[in-house]
Amino acid sequence: MNIDFLFETFRKNKDLTALVWNGKKITYQFFIDQTELWAEKFKEEGISAGKVVSLEGDFSPNCISLFLALIAKDCIIIPQSNTNRVGREIKDKLSQVETYIYCDENDNVTWESTDLVSNHPYYSKLNKIKKPGLVLFSSGTSGDPKAAVHDFSLLLEKFKMDRRTFTTLNFLLFDHWGGLNTMLHTLSNAGTIVTAKNRSPDEIGKLIQENEIQLLPATPTFLNLMLLSGISSKYNLSSLEVITYGAEPMLQTTLMRLKKAFPKIKLQQTYGLIEVGVLRTKSKEDDSLWLKVGGEGYQTRVVEGILHIKTKSTILGYLNADTPMSKDGWFI
């Protein structure tokens, strides 16, 4: 099974808190048990290996355990946020969804089957090699969103390496690879994920104080709002050790203000693409936007001012566009 390594970690840490959701502490034992229950439910619902499943929700107990169970079943997963339905019809049509699973804000689960039978060549390839798939969508800011198809087993490889983990606020959405990357990194290292009812500065400040959160992954837009709202004077944020930022451009002025407001907190820029995953990064200084990307499993080069990336976890391709690859196998 492609996630045996995860469940080995879960079993070793079964009594530890894996998730804090709506103030409730969920242990690793819950995810062991619940994933097994979903596997039985899949039999009833006709969800077999290779089935294309849209999973809509947030980082709730049922949604996370369903996500893990779908990987274990070698399904092709389209993660969808239950707070962002922009362009949903286009995405559903592109991805040839065969089954919808919905997790509402109270973590109730509903199922809906379609009459579609997926037949895209990339899906057929995943079925042939008996691997789970993951479909991620671009933002669509310059046109229709692109649907990137991954062999999920290759993306999971990096989570097999032991790394330091934190009590982490899973700020980014469920349909964002940054959010899924944070979740998988935390769970694979027996850390604790804390989820938010909403992503307002006050809610985040309250959660940091109550749960002694150490790592806050966020967007520059939110971090600017956090500074403007003055939550550092309303809540005790002393537990924070690291703030990571990405998903959109950071202004130098905002970064300087962050460093001044939180001089003891490490500020780290992240870099990722739906086509290759999240790369390891290194900055000159916390208040510098200069960034070196790469790390284990990634090769980089610059050709005529354009970044090229090579990694085993590069997408199989897009469902609805040509994949920009060089003749010698680099993603452009």
Predicted regions and their residues:
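ATP-dependent adenylate-forming carboxylate-activation enzymes
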Residues: 57-58, 77-94, 191-210
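Gly/Ser/Thr-rich phosphate-binding loop
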Residues: 215, 229-287
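Conserved AMP-binding/adenylate-forming
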Residues: 24, 40-83, 171-173
